[in-house]
Amino acid sequence: MCQSRYLLFLATLVLLNHLTSARVIPVSGPAKCLNQSQNLLKTTDDMVRTAREKLKHYSCTAGDIDHEDITRDKTSTLEACLPLELHKNESCLATKETSSIIRGSCLPPQKTSLMMTLCLGSIYEDLKMYQSEFQAINAALQSHNHQQITLDRNMLMAIDELMRSLNHSGETLHQKAPMGEADPYRVKMKLCILLHAFSTRVMTINRVMNYLSSS
């Protein structure tokens, strides 16, 4: 009887140790970045849906707005993040200077390459530009007496979290100057344009993170 209890006690200890070890297994960097990009995709889609509903009189649909890419001629995400077999101007892209040196956890050692480093650096710069624009627009929206719409805090947090994973350099982000007394109609139209452009870019980011986290 005593021996049976002792064996049961040992088995319980082994099980508890196994469960404890399972809890503390850290999520790999690429997997964490994928989770963050998926969260960003969800919160961005939610924000686009909210904008379409609340700004239905502003023609805030993808087919009605004038599409504008604020990252054009400033980053090379679309070129650098192409599959390696499709790269035609790798040497040209490689000579471009990037203002971000990736020190984050999204790039696994087995997939490290010059082009992927450029890709993640460009993604970081994209997020930084959109973050700055969204902060300025949100401040303008909140300053209006009738707060018809403001940016979803969850989306802004998702941008910040992925940026921190992409770059651990401790860079201080500079906020864009407030828009001041901007016309409410123009502010909301700019919000629609930015949201649709950002949604498209987030899809690209999510595909990259899917690739990096795959075995």
From Swiss-Prot:
It comes from the Eukaryota. Gene3D superfamilies: 1.20.1250.10. One of its GO terms (cellular component) is interleukin-12 complex. Coiled coil: none annotated. Disulfide bonds join 33-106, 60-192, 81-119. Belongs to the IL-6 superfamily. PANTHER family: INTERLEUKIN-12 SUBUNIT ALPHA (PTHR48485:SF1), INTERLEUKIN-12 SUBUNIT BETA-RELATED (PTHR48485). This is Interleukin-12 subunit alpha.
